[in-house]
């Protein structure tokens, strides 16, 4: 739901426990949009952003820079990852953010960026594909602040986090000078009052001349958060600008997240989705109506129920193992969903074993057992499978497994099953 930075910041502000922060990360189900789309949305709400244009070819980059009619330009690779400036491309070309001074430079840099993968600390070694660049005018900043809006899970209310120290790693600010971080809790029934917007603006450290526009920007950012079903609005930096005739305050970098559950009423926003930026297995899982998040371990997990899935991963860790994924097949575990889940798990070449943990309430364990046996045969599974089944029709389920001739280690209890799957991966 939130970026790692925001979750860490909330935790340091005493709003979320570490456990809740991890759970929120593992349940990430939101849309992120490219920077040029974020700027488009901000402008629709009357919020200042540096003038700029996206480009999808080197020739378009040349024309975009020409249209801006200045030698003070920035070109940014459009990839949904942090740390673009410190990243590098799969060709060895350095940095996803470059200062440029001419249309020809824009074209030359775009050639290096477009249709290549940008690799940062957040992407892993594969990187993220770059199919667009964003060319913007450089602005002269007088002061940089930080502002984010998100839901506080503790109070169940929207919360604004503000700091007069922006344009840097906000986590470091929270550690070094926690008093520099201000929090404002908003009653959803009342909304953001003009007075609170002014209080937030005042906390950002802008000059008196810029206070009114800053308060208006805060109000409009909150409108975006509420009207567009956002899960996160993060502006870093929110800048006071010098020598600009149109705006004293500008969002010079923005990050948004939008709630997937509201996609049906945010069709325009969701038309901006870039599937090339998402993990293909997670995209496939969504089509299957499975909740899947890839992790870094070697034990594939298939479980029904998010809470049981979290507990299963905990038990694996407690026994010295490392989960390769979070996979909740929900209350509709069927032979088909079992097979789809196995396909997702086995697409990860790091998986050395599969752990199936099913509690049969609505779900019948004999159906699950049939699915396990069919999936193991059809997919020619070569890694060990450990299955812990409990609940409705469990005896019939165990009987199906035992008579199948397929090598599946069947258990009644969770802890012995977890120990077995860890043992199998270690041997």
Curated annotation (Swiss-Prot):
Protein name: Succinate--CoA ligase [ADP-forming] subunit beta, mitochondrial
Binding site for ATP: 76, 83-85, 144
Pathway, per record: Carbohydrate metabolism; tricarboxylic acid cycle; succinate from succinyl-CoA (ligase route): step 1/1
Cysteines engaged in disulfide bonds, as pairs: none
GO MF term (any one): ATP binding
Co-factor remark: Binds 1 Mg(2+) ion per subunit.
Positions annotated to bind substrate: 304, 361-363
Modified residues (Phosphoserine): 102, 263, 276
Catalytic activity: succinate + ATP + CoA = succinyl-CoA + ADP + phosphate
Keyword set includes Zinc: no
Superkingdom: Eukaryota
GO cellular component terms, A-Z: mitochondrion; succinate-CoA ligase complex; succinate-CoA ligase complex (ADP-forming)
Places the protein is found: Mitochondrion
Function per UniProt: Succinyl-CoA synthetase functions in the citric acid cycle (TCA), coupling the hydrolysis of succinyl-CoA to the synthesis of ATP and thus represents the only step of substrate-level phosphorylation in the TCA. The beta subunit provides nucleotide specificity of the enzyme and binds the substrate succinate, while the binding sites for coenzyme A and phosphate are found in the alpha subunit.
Ranges where the ATP-grasp domain occurs: 39-284
Pfam families in the cross-refs: ATP-grasp_2, Ligase_CoA
EC number: 6.2.1.5
Keywords from the named record: ATP-binding, Ligase, Magnesium, Metal-binding, Mitochondrion, Nucleotide-binding, Phosphoprotein, Transit peptide, Tricarboxylic acid cycle
